[in-house]
Amino acid sequence: MSDTLSRLAEVLEARKGAAPDSSYVASLYHKGLNKILEKVGEESVETILAAKDAAASGDCKDLIYETADLWFHSLVMLAALGQHPQAVLDELDRRFGLSGHAEKAARPQSE
């Protein structure tokens, strides 16, 4: 796993027990999962809009910025649910080299 993701995972874990006024992440944890999910949704929309703007202008600066926000808030969400970024990387590794169609077909069917 990248050093950046490892360091960030450590910080996110440490913030779980911190006072809400000590950091942005601690305040998110204190507000609860619904607030964290709201932020993930907000950052998802902002990333989509930045991608549309980048496609039109060729300037990807805002897209990179918004994607970083989305990844960050997704990592906060995972940490809030007791998951480590390595679990996502492991899943990506598992999928590497698989056809997207084959991977999707192998998933359990929703009812």
From Swiss-Prot:
GO BP annotation list = L-histidine biosynthetic process
InterPro entries documented for this protein: HisE (IPR008179), PRib-ATP_PPHydrolase-like (IPR021130)
Q: According to the UniProt entry, what is the EC number of this protein?
A: 3.6.1.31
Pathway membership? Amino-acid biosynthesis; L-histidine biosynthesis; L-histidine from 5-phospho-alpha-D-ribose 1-diphosphate: step 2/9
> Is Cytoplasm there in the keyword field?
yes
Q: Which organism is it from?
A: Ectopseudomonas mendocina (strain ymp)
Q: What is the gene name? A: hisE
Know the name of this protein? Phosphoribosyl-ATP pyrophosphatase
According to the UniProt record, what class of enzyme is this? hydrolase
Which superkingdom does the taxonomy of this entry point to? Bacteria
Q: Which reaction does it catalyse?
A: 1-(5-phospho-beta-D-ribosyl)-ATP + H2O = 1-(5-phospho-beta-D-ribosyl)-5'-AMP + diphosphate + H(+)
